[in-house]
Design a protein with these regions (language model features):
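Conserved class I S-adenosyl-L-methionine
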Residues: 1-37, 50-51, 70-73, 147-154, ...
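C-terminal alpha-helical "lid/dimerization" subdomain adjacent to the S-adenosyl-L-methionine
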Residues: 17-21, 133-191
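Class I SAM-dependent methyltransferase SAM/SAH-binding core
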Residues: 40-92
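A short acidic, Gly/Pro-enriched loop at the edge of an enzyme's catalytic core
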Residues: 91-103
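A short SAM/SAH-binding and catalytic strip from SAM-dependent methyltransferases
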Residues: 102-114
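A short glycine-rich, Lys/Arg-flanked "PGG" loop and its adjoining helix->strand segment in the class I
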Residues: 116-131
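C-terminal lobe and adjacent flexible extensions of AdoMet/dcAdoMet transferase-like proteins
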Residues: 191-197
Length: 197
């Protein structure tokens, strides 16, 4: 189960992510948050709170995380006073329809068990005209695509991490209007911006 795996690695997560943070992930996190409009914001998969440092100080909203152990670390991190933390799965959000002006996630949907259900929930809880932004590693185009298809056999078994998802296509199929896709790192990372209609 994905939740149990993240509970088991929570204490080591930031150590593992450290090199990636230094090699450009910090910049990508900042770029992701820069795409968000002001208003009531939802973060899906806040993890240990690595994005909190990039939140504008006047941010208000909710940061969700399904791993209790990750959330126990996140709660110790400084964050804007208007941001609440909540343990929850992306596929079953406990919010009223049109509760948020925007939602975002960074490197989360590769591990979401039922992404179509989670995208449907984002479409429901973000108001019409609102924004959904994802920073995700995805199946790259070209010669790397089949390589990632092969790697996916092992990454899903070992880490429950899907490295070959076509995330922008899945978002579109769920009814989100994809307005921009920025490709990074040979297409392995995508910054995807959607509008809720």
């Amino acid at each position: 189960m994905v939740q149990a795996r993240y509970d088991s690695v929570a204490q080591h997560y930031e150590g593992v992510m450290g090199p990636f943070q230094r090699w450009g992930l910090v910049k990508l996190r900042k770029e992701t948050l820069s795409q968000l409009p002001p208003g009531n914001i939802l973060e899906i998969g806040a993890g240990t709170g690595l994005n909190f440092v990039h939140y504008p100080q006047d941010t208000r909203g909710v940061a969700t995380e399904f791993s209790r152990e990750m959330l126990n670390i996140a709660v110790t991190k400084p964050r804007p006073g208007g941001v609440q933390l909540l343990q929850n799965r992306a596929e079953d959000l406990p919010f009223k329809t049109h509760s948020f002006d925007a939602a975002f996630a960074t490197l989360v949907f590769c591990s979401v068990e039922h992404p179509a259900a989670a995208f449907a929930e984002l479409r429901r809880v973000v108001r019409p005209g609102g924004t959904v932004v994802l920073l995700e590693h995805v199946r790259p185009h070209g010669i790397l695509g089949p390589v990632f298809d092969f790697l996916n056999v092992f990454s899903t078994r070992l880490f429950e991490d899907h490295v070959n998802r076509r995330t922008a296509k899945m978002m579109s199929e769920a009814g989100l209007e994809v307005v921009d896709v920025k490709s990074r790192l040979l297409g392995i990372i995508n910054l995807i911006k959607c509008r809720v209609s």
